[in-house]
Amino acid sequence: MSAADVIQAWDQADPSAIHPLRQVSEDAYWASGEAQASMLASVIPEGAKVMDFGCGDGRVAIPLAALGYDVTAVDSSQRMLDRLADRAPDLTTVQADADGVASHLGRRRMDAVYALAVLIHHSYADCLHIVGKLRAATKLGGILVLDWPVSETPGEADSWIGVTTWSRQQQADACAQIGLERVDSELPWGVYRAVKAG
């Protein structure tokens, strides 16, 4: 699927389809966001300027902001951002895809960027493009937390709810090209430091 197809499917998704815990209960869904915000806080410096790329309705962005982070919530779907604003009207939101992030930031860079349940839906080429744009939005030495799974049998998703996986070598090559250095972490997602590419 192209990035445009993934974005369109995401924008049209029923709220109950965007996360499996929402089918359990709304409380379980929002509690999972609080738990993930706490995990992110273990690797992101206190009070940092943070971008949640692909924030959806704010499941993680809202509790991370409540922990004292300066969160900018970015999503390609205005419908998702409207749902977020209903719960947290003071949270900064930006409607943009990866290509639109730079125009919002201008010369500013974030201390940290995270993308959870975003990259898994995209092709290899689109994922590399997105990660490159997120790296460019991050200060040198900043932190990126990416839900970017590896597998012994990597493959590209064939639908927007599929999961694209990478080999360790594919990821290592991408990191060297983009300017990411893997950081040891207990998190269930990859944690990277923004370094010079090459």
Give, region by region, the residue ranges found by the protein language model.
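Conserved acidic residues
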Residues: 111
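A conserved beta-strand element that flanks and buttresses the S-adenosyl-L-methionine
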Residues: 114
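Conserved beta-strand/loop positions that form the S-adenosyl-L-methionine
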Residues: 53
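Short catalytic micro-motifs in class I SAM-dependent methyltransferases
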Residues: 117-118
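Class I (Rossmann-like) S-adenosyl-L-methionine-dependent methyltransferase catalytic domain
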Residues: 1-47, 57-105, 122-129, 133, ...
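Active-site charged/polar residues at nucleotide-handling catalytic sites that mediate phosphoryl
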Residues: 108
